[in-house]
Amino acid sequence: MIKSFNQPDAWIKRISAYAGINEELAKRHEVVSIQQINFEGEYLQNDVSYHFLKFRLPSKYFPVTLNKDIKQQQPDIVVIQGTHFPIQVLLLRLKLGSKTRIIVHHHAERPFTGIKKMFQRLADRHIDAYLFASRQMGLSWVKKGNLASPQKIHEVMEVSSVFHQIDKVEAKGFTGIKKKLVYLWVGRLNANKDPIATVKGFLKFAQRYPDAVLYMIYHNDELLPDVYELLEEHPNGNAVKMIGQAANNELLYWYNSADFFVSGSHYEGSGTAVCEAMSCGCIPVVTNIDSFRMITNNGNCGLLYQPGNVDELCKVLLQTVEIDKAEKRRLCLEYFRDHLSFSAIARGIEEIAASL
């Protein structure tokens, strides 16, 4: 239970990157979304019926009340958010019977090992479809033996973006950015996101293009001392601006102020910030991992490099100076609309559900 939230509208706003998918589905279907915060009751917003339920700890593993509520809805389709609930899936299937279709939506989880893997394989027999941001990610679960059939794996983005493109002059008026070569980082400062390799690669690039600036927005400062140490020791350290936290609504202006979005992630379930950046026409310079290949249409909408490879990052950053930015921006916006938007994700889920 998310105890810090006790108002339904505040919580729905907090999960807007997910809620927008349900709102699109609700335009054509009856949608019930079950949530758990410090509130109990029903709440209707944008045609989505939210059921806020409270459970004690044992109910997390043996969700009798939850399954009873689900059965009362008489659903045709149940979408479970997350792949790490095999016991709960088994109990739900027992409650619902065989007619209701169960779809599981992957959210960055890794395949279980040991006895948990056994339960995952058992639950797999009772699941009709899986949604992964990248089909290749789902196939890796099949290869490891956690899931049995590649036929159940479908490629559907995990989240979308509430942001949109606005005038760059307006955006820069808010952020105060005056530079022409603007790059943006949004994410945690941890080992997986690899800000160290990112900063090293950018500083190397900035030696060639001293007018280039990387703005870093973050809400986790795990590696902040290491980043500062890098910047203090480098002669071009002022090419990286450590912004810190930014309110979610302010990100609209940051994404629209930047020309390029930079990520150093070694693993992502999807890539929320990359998706948000693309919705604003900000071109991604990201690592060559499964989820980012899907989000960038195999690099067609951006530039890819190997995680942790400082020299390769510098090389692709040098390419950003030469490419046709207007054309790349157009490709970003077009691909976002057709594959990453709320309407595109909802359409994909509808098509999969209809095929079951």
What does each model-identified segment do?
Residues G176-K193, V199-F202, Y215:
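Conserved donor-binding/catalytic core segment of Leloir-type glycosyltransferases
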Residues H266:
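Aromatic "clamp/platform" in nucleotide-sugar-dependent glycosyltransferases that forms part
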Residues N298-G299, L303-V310, L318-K325:
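Conserved acidic donor-binding segment of nucleotide-sugar-dependent glycosyltransferases
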Residues I283-V286:
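Short hydrophobic beta-strand element within catalytic cores of glycosyltransferases
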